[in-house]
From Swiss-Prot:
The keyword Acetylation applies. Belongs to the histone-like Alba family. Keywords: Acetylation, Chromosome, Cytoplasm, DNA condensation, DNA-binding. The modification N6-acetyllysine is found at K11. It comes from Pyrococcus furiosus (strain ATCC 43587 / DSM 3638 / JCM 8422 / Vc1). It comes from the Archaea. SUPFAM superfamilies: AlbA-like (SSF82704). Binds double-stranded DNA tightly but without sequence specificity. Involved in DNA compaction. This is DNA/RNA-binding protein Alba.
Length: 93
């Protein structure tokens, strides 16, 4: 999968990310990856479910879900563990 078919989830409203995913599929992407970490994980799940069940129903399916942990440095020099998720949506043939 090409790196340009990735939507990174942040603090914006969910519908902004839904529109970004739908735009990727409308431009011909076979797969779109939704990535998030920390508190944005629930928003990433919401985006995937809204795209799959409301906008592109019977057109898009979940290919795989990857979860993990990243070690991020803090301001005082220590490291903290942050959860990550990647949801890969694929267009049905």
């Amino acid at each position: 999968m090409a790196e340009e078919h990735v939507v990174y989830i942040g603090k914006k409203p969910v519908m902004n990310y839904v529109l970004a995913v739908i735009t990727q599929f409308n431009e011909g992407a076979k797969e779109v990856s939704i990535k998030a970490r920390g508190r944005a994980i629930s928003r990433a799940v919401d985006v995937a479910e809204i795209v799959r069940n409301r906008f592109l129903k019977d057109t898009v399916d979940i290919k795989e879900i990857k979860i993990g942990t990243e070690e991020l440095p803090t301001a005082d020099g220590r490291t903290t563990n942050t959860s990550t998720i990647e949801i890969v949506l694929e267009r049905k043939v």
